[in-house]
Structures are given as C-alpha cells and as structure tokens.
C-alpha cells in the first residue's frame, strides 16, 4: 500500500470514540503529546477541531478509537505534490461559544470548515444550560451559528450536522 507523508499539523478534525467517557482525561494526556505537533503549531497553539463521543462498544473490545481528517497529503488528488504548500489551514475561535484548550472551534481548509462538537454550555458561566433536550439542542446550535458567523458564513452554508443524544 502507498503511504502519504503528512505532519500532524495537517490534521483538521479528530473524532474520539470512547467506551467510557470517564477515560477522556487519560486520552487527553496522550493527546497533548501529539498536539500541537510542530514548533509553528505550538507558537500559534494550533490544535484540530475535535469531537469525543461515548459508544456502547468498539471493534476488538478496544477502549478507544480515533479517526482523523487530514487536509492534504503528498499527491492527494486533486493537489499535485508541488501544490501542497499552497494549501491554507486556518483555525478560528470566537468568544461567543465555549473554548477548549484541546481543540479549535473551527478549522478551515480548501472550501470546508470543520467545527468541533458543541456542548450545551453557557459560554459566560461554563455551566450546562437549564432545561431539557430542546433547550440544550438550541444552545448547541447557537454555538454552531456563532462559530459559523465568526468566519463570515451563515447557517445555510452548513452541509452536514451530526447530533448525539443520550436517549
């Protein structure tokens, strides 16, 4: 098989699937040994957009499974190898949504923006919003709207949304 040679800085989105969400702190300890990767990434505190989800089970009874979206690689179509350095990866955070030291709210590359999963947190208090699933969903979507608008887009530009619910 052919391998692509890309640095971790080219990762724009990470999805973490955990058998037990209580293991997230241990995952974070490992995660911070990989991100940020390069001196440049550390200087600007670049980390990919990120989602963590608890799942009922994983292949081979694993405790964690991680997937990544990479912005480009040597010769990845439609870019030629020599065009690789012309691709821009642009991270952005807004104060209108909760921030996390381990992820960026949105990471743009090509004509896509990858947005980190949003929890129903009041960005001013850092606490879950009052109410049920309707109020919590509205808060999550308000964060997504604020993030989308902070990069000059509107909700009509969103092409995919993943929703994770307890019941």
What are these regions (language model features)?
Residues 2-12, 18-160, 164-167:
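N-terminal presequence-like segments and the immediate start of the first folded domain
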């Amino acid at each position: 098989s052919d391998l692509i040679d890309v640095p971790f800085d080219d990762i724009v989105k990470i999805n973490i699937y955990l058998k037990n969400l209580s293991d997230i702190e241990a995952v974070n300890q490992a995660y911070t040994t990989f991100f940020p990767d390069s001196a440049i990434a550390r200087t600007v505190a670049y980390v990919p957009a990120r989602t963590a989800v608890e799942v009922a089970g994983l292949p081979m009874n694993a405790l964690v499974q991680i997937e990544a979206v990479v912005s480009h690689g040597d010769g990845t179509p439609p870019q030629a190898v020599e065009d690789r350095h012309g691709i821009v990866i642009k991270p952005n955070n807004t104060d209108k949504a909760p921030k996390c030291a381990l992820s960026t709210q949105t990471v743009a590359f090509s004509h896509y923006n990858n947005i980190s999963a949003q929890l129903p947190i009041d960005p001013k208090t850092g606490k879950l919003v009052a109410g049920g699933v309707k109020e919590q969903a509205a808060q999550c979507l308000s964060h997504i709207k604020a993030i989308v608008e902070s990069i000059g887009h509107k909700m009509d530009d969103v092409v995919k949304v993943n929703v994770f619910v307890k019941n």
